[in-house]
Amino acid sequence: EKDTVLIIGAGPTGICTLLCVMLKKPKRIIVCEKDENRVRFIKEHYPDVYTVLPEECLEYVQKNSDHGGADVVFEVAGAPSTFRLAWECARPNAIVTVVALYDEAQTLPLPDMYGKNLTFKTGGVDGCDCEETLRLIAEGKIDTEPLITHTYPLSRIEDAYELFENKKDGVIKVAVEC
């Protein structure tokens, strides 16, 4: 409840991360995102969440946290620059969780990180929390409805894939009616 949490990336996984973080009621949640449609989505559906562009993120987090950086960082974007941004925005002794997948290996610039004493956690979904997640959705504690921004009949599944793959029309998730 006293933490500042930074989520880098507001795609489907980032928004689901946001929904789970909101259950813990941290003092402040900041979402870093460059896509204006995703920023608009966050502001519309989660007005208490702060949003910031990547190029302004480090300064914004430092100014808007109690300890000179985020207490917890979730790196969900997976862009070439977001791994570095994640640890740079973290305060000393913070936890940085890397959910994103990268196309290339990331470098730990240890001299630059010296003194931060960060804890890194990595990994995607291992399935061990699926039962609890489904229970929270069923109980209405996690509302995933807003994430479904488009619906297509099964006969138009190729159109749905094209929309999602090309990130058109502010798509977050597509539901396919069977």
Segments the model singles out, each with a brief description of its role:
Residues 11, 15, 36, 80, ...:
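Glycine-rich phosphate-binding loop at the start of an alpha helix
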Residues 33, 100, 124:
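Conserved acidic E/D residue at the C-terminus of a beta-strand in Rossmann-like folds
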Residues 1-55:
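Mid-domain Rossmann-like dinucleotide-binding core that forms the NAD(H)/NADP(H) cofactor-binding site
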Residues 1-4, 39-119:
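Glycine-rich cofactor phosphate-binding loops and adjacent beta1-alpha1 units
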Residues 31, 75, 122:
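Conserved SAM-binding loop
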